Swiss-Prot record:
Organism whose genome encodes this protein: Escherichia coli O150:H5 (strain SE15)
SUPFAM superfamilies assigned to the protein according to its UniProt record, in alphabetical order: Isochorismatase-like hydrolases
Induction text: Up-regulated by the nitrogen regulatory protein C (NtrC also called GlnG) and repressed by RutR.
Class of enzymatic activity (EC top level): hydrolase
Protein name as it appears in the record: Ureidoacrylate amidohydrolase RutB
């Protein structure tokens, strides 16, 4: 068992029955010229987040944690995004940006596009799971819950973008399904001003989960002895 120093208190978990979840580390969210950038959000400080996620993934994999990568987006015709009868049609900034700039149609968050791809620095490895998701929450219309329950996983460590949208949405839904959620704050980044990051972390540590950081997470894992299963 590993005890992780966190806010509002430490949390103990078995790494080999836990998952590290990397949320939407796609060009869309972390690279200049991607969807968030084109929609007017600041992505200029995402490089350190990418490096911190690399560090967390390496440590988690060595500890026997399952690594799950999410990619947010839809088919090339955006059928999966929903039409005017879906609130997603009206609230998705990617869809709104494409309606304002028709030349971007088919380029933002479309499966197979550069925008949809994970950033070059983050490469899933054999044994990892890569899941597409059509909405903010990674539990909606995906097999995430089944994947976790079938492996006896109850503790989820979150990284990725955006803290205040897809990360928080997935952690909240996990809370309602009886999962313990931890966010590594320096391995996440908000969509919007800095106060959005602070508000999301406040919500998580006060109501829905725990907040720690990459160095503390790696130190906790490295101080734990793991009995390897042959």
């Amino acid at each position: 068992m590993t005890t992780l120093t966190a806010r509002p208190e430490a949390i103990t978990f078995d790494p080999q029955q836990s998952a590290l979840i990397v949320v939407d580390m796609q060009n869309a969210y972390a690279t200049p010229g991607g969807y968030l950038d084109l929609a007017g959000f600041d992505v200029s400080t995402t490089r350190p987040v990418i490096a911190n996620i690399q560090t967390a993934v390496t440590a988690a994999r060595a500890a026997g944690m399952l690594i799950i990568w999410f990619q947010n987006g839809w088919d090339e015709q955006y059928v999966e995004a929903g039409g005017p009868g879906s609130p997603n049609f009206h609230k998705s900034n990617a869809l709104k940006t494409m309606r304002k700039q028709p030349q971007l149609q088919g380029k933002l968050l479309a499966k197979g596009s550069w925008d949809y791809q994970l950033v070059d620095e983050l490469v899933p490895q054999p044994g990892d799971i890569v899941l597409p998701k059509p909405r903010y929450s990674g539990f909606f219309n995906t097999p995430l819950d089944s994947i976790l329950r079938s492996r006896g996983i109850r503790h989820l460590v979150f990284t990725g973008i955006a803290t205040n949208v897809c990360v928080e949405s997935t952690l909240r839904d996990g809370f309602f399904l009886e999962y313990f959620g931890v966010v590594l704050e320096d391995a996440t980044h908000q969509a919007g001003p800095e106060f959005a990051q602070k508000a999301a972390l406040f919500n998580i540590e006060t109501f829905f989960g725990w907040v720690s950081d990459v160095e503390t997470f790696c130190d906790a894992l490295s101080s734990t002895s793991f009995a390897r299963i042959a």
